[in-house]
Design a protein with these regions (language model features):
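N-terminal accessory beta-strand-rich subdomains and adjacent acidic, glycine-rich linkers
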Residues: 11-183
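Bacterial Sec-dependent N-terminal signal peptides
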Residues: 1-10
Length: 183
């Protein structure tokens, strides 16, 4: 059984090892991904892009040169963690694009992640990363907001011990002017 299928020449489907999570990555005018859990859409097609200092945008009109997949099922020793070993099990989809870059998606049983990969030999700076999260419903979220600093400005939110109380609210009720962190 394949974990990656070509769809309409621009869409690629990747499933988690258990098959419960599925993401479809599409390379059209934009690079997009979606997410489904047990066949239920939890994220609609959402764009990804990186803007470089020379004006290049990885993710705008991407052209796939080559696509391949791999599966990993291994353990790593973890002498400083609460478990002696960490189990690493995922399926991956790598899309190599024209222009010297690629995007890799990994589907684990409990989540999907991505990363941009460069084969460009000259130095560059990333000016902006665009990542959308287009939810089909106004889901409820539990969010730990970063405490604002004494001056109340945006930068003061970066000085943080990552300890805080959590706010539970619909996505539409979250504060876009506040930083949050992952628990």
């Amino acid at each position: 059984m394949g974990i990656c299928e070509l769809q309409a020449q621009t869409g690629y489907t990747l499933s988690s090892p258990s098959g419960r999570l599925r993401t479809t990555v599409a390379a059209g005018e934009e690079l997009t991904y979606d997410l489904a859990l047990d066949g239920r859409t939890v994220m609609e097609p959402s764009a990804l892009a990186l803007e470089l200092d020379d004006g290049t945008v990885w993710g705008r009109n991407p052209r796939v040169k080559r696509a391949w997949r791999t599966s990993v099922d291994t353990t790593h020793p973890s002498p400083l963690y609460r478990s002696a070993e960490v189990h690493d099990r995922y399926n991956a989809l790598i899309l190599e694009m024209k222009g010297g870059w690629a995007v890799e998606f990994r589907a684990y049983d409990d989540g999907v992640g991505y990363r941009f990969v460069s084969s460009v030999r000259k130095p560059f700076h990333i000016m902006n990363e665009r990542v959308e999260y287009r939810f089909p419903h106004d889901f409820e979220a539990t969010v730990p907001y970063v405490k604002t600093g004494a001056d109340g400005n945006w930068e003061s939110q970066y000085h943080n011990s990552f300890e805080n109380t959590y706010t539970t609210a619909p996505l539409s009720g979250l504060n876009p002017g506040r930083l949050a962190f992952l628990p």
